């Protein structure tokens, strides 16, 4: 089971998280842009709808729609990329609100100081605002990643041979449910414990620079 956790569970969580984070940053940036024109307003409305739908529906339903629904329109994916897409879309919706809140939390004086030294909006955002916003969002994003590690067990329902799927296969053969599932739970806990420790260290290190 440890091999499955290393080869499938962790890569699934890591790839999904960073793809989701990319989606989150794009959505958050769009939602925080000034909206003087109709196309941008429509794009912002679309982002709000995306967040509302994803946050308002179970992840399992989202996984099933992608895995079983896409083949109906001629798109067939393997289980692993299906899980990555589903997790990334889900993470993107939740993390987008985290990143957006962090951007809004940056004092307006930071914008004004950037403009005062000759930066335009894009330069101020990339060089001054976004680094601080990501630093502020580290605790919430770290918790999202830890939750993603645990949520990868849902991928077993679309036949991804990650940790929980392997545990199911073993129990189907020997019926040692308590032993096998306890071992799986222990592996999940060890991963999350290590990640929580690293999160604490990272927060302490970042706090020195705030």
Curated annotation (Swiss-Prot):
Membrane topology designation: Multi-pass membrane protein
Function: Probably part of a binding-protein-dependent transport system for an amino acid. Probably responsible for the translocation of the substrate across the membrane.
Entry's Gene Ontology molecular function annotations: L-cystine transmembrane transporter activity
CDD domains referenced in this protein's UniProt entry, alphabetically: TM_PBP2 (cd06261)
Membrane-spanning parts: 10-30, 57-77, 79-99, 177-197
Positions of disulphide bridges: none
Keyword annotations from UniProtKB, A to Z: Amino-acid transport, Cell inner membrane, Cell membrane, Membrane, Transmembrane, Transmembrane helix, Transport
CC per GO annotation: ATP-binding cassette (ABC) transporter complex; plasma membrane
Name recorded for this polypeptide: Probable amino-acid ABC transporter permease protein HI_0179
Domain of life assignment: Bacteria
Subcellular location: Cell inner membrane
NCBIfam families for the chain: HEQRo_perm_3TM
Family indicated by similarity: Belongs to the binding-protein-dependent transport system permease family. HisMQ subfamily.
Any Gene Ontology biological process: L-cystine transport
SUPFAM superfamilies per UniProt: MetI-like
Main location: membrane
Domain annotation ABC transmembrane type-1: ranges: 6-199
């Amino acid at each position: 089971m440890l091999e499955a956790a290393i080869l499938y569970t962790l890569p699934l969580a890591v790839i999904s998280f960073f793809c989701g984070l990319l989606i989150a940053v794009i959505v958050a940036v769009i939602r925080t842009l000034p909206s003087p024109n109709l196309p941008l307003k429509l794009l912002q409305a679309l982002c709000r709808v995306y967040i509302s739908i994803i946050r308002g529906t179970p992840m399992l339903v989202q996984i099933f729609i992608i895995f079983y629904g896409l083949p109906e329109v001629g798109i067939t994916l393997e289980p692993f990329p299906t899980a990555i897409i589903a997790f990334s879309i889900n993470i993107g919706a939740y993390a987008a609100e985290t990143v957006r809140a962090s951007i809004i939390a940056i004092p307006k004086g930071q914008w004004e100081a950037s403009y005062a030294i000759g930066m335009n909006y894009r330069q101020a955002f990339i060089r001054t605002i976004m680094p601080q916003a990501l630093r502020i969002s580290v605790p919430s994003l770290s918790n999202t990643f830890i939750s993603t590690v645990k949520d990868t067990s849902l991928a077993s329902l679309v036949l991804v041979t990650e940790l929980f799927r392997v545990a199911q296969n073993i129990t189907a053969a020997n019926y040692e449910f308590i032993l096998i599932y306890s071992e799986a739970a222990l592996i999940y806990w060890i991963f999350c414990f290590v990640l929580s420790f690293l999160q604490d260290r990272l927060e302490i290190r970042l706090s020195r620079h705030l």
